[in-house]
Amino acid sequence: MIKVNRYEIFLDFSFQTGDYKGYEKIEMESDEETVVLDAVGLKIVKAKVNGKEIEFSQDESRVNVKSGSFSGILEVEFEGKVTERKLVGIYKASYKDGYVISTQFEATHARDFIPCFDHPAMKARFKLTVRVDKGLKVISNMPVVREKEENGKVVYEFDETPKMSTYLLYLGIGNFEEIRDEGKIPTIIVATIPGKVQKGRFSMQISRNSIEFYEKYFEIPYQLPKVHLIAIPEFAYGAMENWGAITFRETALLADDSSSVYQKFRVAEVVAHELAHQWFGNLVTLKWWDDLWLNESFATFMSHKAISQLFPSWNFWDYFVLNQTSRALEKDSVSTTHPIEAHVRDPNEVEQMFDDISYGKGASILRMIEAYVGEENFRRGVVNYLKKFSYSNAQGSDLWNSISEVYGSDISPIMADWITKPGYPMVRVSVSGKRVSLEQERFSLIGNVENLLYKIPLTMEVNGKVVTHLLDKERDTMVFEEDVKSLKVNVNRTGFYRVFYYNNSDLVFNSNLSELDKWGIINDYWAFLLAGKIGFKEYERVISKFFNDKDFLPVNELSNELFTLHAINPDKYQGIAKEFHRIQLKNWRNSKDELGRLTYSNILYRLAAIDDEFSLGLSELFRFYGSLDSDTRQGVAVAYAITYEDNSVDELLERFRKETFDEEKLRYLTAMLFFRKPYLVGNTLSLILSGEIKKQDIPLTLSTAAYNPYAKSAVLNWIKMHINFMREAYKGTGILGRRLAEVIPLIGIGAERETEQFFSNLNMPEAERGIGTGLELLKAYSRLK
């Protein structure tokens, strides 16, 4: 048994070369003959136990120290180097006029930085001291307690952290600018590269309000004296919850009054998500990566709860359903899915678990359970859980036990069904007079999955009255007092299942449908179309009832579906996609509220991509681009690119190169990915290899281009030629597999055999699940071409 109490770490950096020398003292106890430290890419120089130098051996991932049983101090002297090839461990994040050094350790990359016991359950305190060149700012989890000049450099000594896991340690070095809110505890600090920090005031206010919300909800104060929000110019993920030093890509942290509604929504959600982790993940941490979903789904769930409280007019739970639940339902419909609680044998498998199942499905199940036990019972259960396991480790069963104790009934059997089984059910509903027949089966887009039985907490509205029923067998029948005239199942879509009204869909339209109900019908029928359960005529008959709808959820869901159909086959689906988007453009043109402006922005951009005639007129606004509001700009830029093609390249490229803020830069990039001519899109993709498109933006670039039906071959060919480049850029992140799952179903249309052959023959264990998902979705999408 090994117990680690404390790391005392000294690091001496050369900012110019990226080399550093390290010396650490690990206060610990061990009854093992050999202590095994995790270390990757580090050179171990010397090891001592209680002052005595001892033998060690080193391989690619571990250091074996022949210590014998001891209690005391393990000292390790080592050397490391900042990487420029990947975006994990300790790496160089470049920007136009320089670079910063930053770290990204989750899940298993603290070992790339220092020799350590890189396991979430082996919590310890960290005391960090860093010596670095003058003129730089150094950021870590805790405040600087002492700063002094020494040998022409500056030494920064940081306060000691609370007990925490290695993956939450952070170090950033660079020419950072900062703004502070010191009015209350904790101090909130936003740090950016020069010239961008003023765009951090919105996220600073979100942070203050979110912390106050969480302190009240969890009944536990934020535990550190400060929290840094750090914008990193190259960052693989959206953000990372390092305790007290949260890192973000710039588009997930920076926004102001000139930003689009989408940008503000994104910043608010990501900031609130990472702050939720400061309690749920940092204060109480998973025992092992099997329960990764608990960290991520809970932070996703709580961020939407917080933003709904802070901005009631944003209707953020609608936004949750449209983005989180919708994506999770699709990814959970194929054989390559996994249970929410998936057994992780090797830490290297962890990266593939940061997906729509761990985030979106997990959060949707939490929403379902909260509805089942009640909001206050759910909250009190969470509070008890956090207080019981503070500064310690826990697992999913501990949370269910805490909620069950408050609720007064054991919820574990229901939870087990939803978190240990892959997939989800479809409930087939048929009506005859007073009888409602229910039948469940596991839903699949391709039909190649094991059928499973689920405990489904059904909610139904029959003739205007709400009824609940636990469907825990394959078939069941309910008999009502009078003939069923109106019926809807899964009221307000709180349940994670689909409903197929067998020859009775008109009964649904006799019901009073909420916005969430309408979204559910549209989303279900899209899935049934993809699965081949209905034909396009039946799908069109159902969705046509919502063509002139004026609610955010159904309109944006239909826009997503019709835009996808257009990407699959523009000749076949352009007419219906154009008709819908033209109707809705009129409905939302004069919207003033946030959801209305967001919807208008989406409709405008997509209509420009679909309708050449509309683009021709809209492109005339490009001459006034600088004075346009931010919600209009994307549509205008796309229209300009489509209308002028070759003649727009120089202008768009020049603006792309000059722009310093990523939000605007990505608008120009998106426009250049919607050229009609494939070679122009290919030229845009070449900006990846030149480094003009950041590594962090490669996935977004490819998924955006995949929705251009005229560029499928260009995108597929680029990926085939440069798959090894992408693999190296995203090594250790799991991002490549997740993005291929989104891109393959579209770029493979019309080249199914070529696509399947290429991706099936790749030996890429780190992307295996994502590739499998993409190829299965390609089979479903190909049915519609």
From Swiss-Prot:
UniProt remark on cofactor binding: Binds 1 zinc ion per subunit.
Modification after translation (UniProt): Can be phosphorylated by cell extracts.
Temperature dependence: Optimum temperature is 80 degrees Celsius.
InterPro entries: Aminopeptidase_N-like_N (IPR045357), Aminopeptidase_N-like_N_sf (IPR042097), ERAP1-like_C_dom (IPR024571), M1_APN-typ (IPR034016), Peptidase_M1 (IPR001930), Peptidase_M1_aminopeptidases (IPR050344), Peptidase_M1_dom (IPR014782), Peptidase_M4/M1_CTD_sf (IPR027268)
Site (Transition state stabilizer) location in chain: Y359
Positions annotated to bind substrate: E106, G238, A239, M240, E241, N242
Keywords assigned: Aminopeptidase, Cytoplasm, Hydrolase, Metal-binding, Metalloprotease, Phosphoprotein, Protease, Zinc
Keyword Protease listed: yes
Cofactor(s) required for function per UniProt: Zn(2+)
Residues that coordinate or bind Zn(2+): H273, H277, E296
Any one biological process term the GO annotation gives: proteolysis
Example of a GO cellular component annotation carried by this entry: cytoplasm
Leading EC class: hydrolase
pH dependence: Optimum pH is 6.
GO molecular function: metalloaminopeptidase activity; peptide binding; zinc ion binding
Superkingdom: Archaea
Catalytic activity: Release of an N-terminal amino acid, Xaa-|-Yaa-, in which Xaa is preferably Leu, but may be other amino acids including Pro although not Arg or Lys, and Yaa may be Pro. Amino acid amides and methyl esters are also readily hydrolyzed, but rates on arylamides are exceedingly low
Active site per UniProt: E274
Quaternary organization: Co-immunoprecipitates with the 60 kDa chaperonin.
Reported function: Preferentially acts as a leucyl-aminopeptidase, although it also has activity against other substrates.
Name assigned to this protein: Leucyl aminopeptidase
Species whose genome carries this gene: Saccharolobus solfataricus (strain ATCC 35092 / DSM 1617 / JCM 11322 / P2)
Gene for this chain: ape2
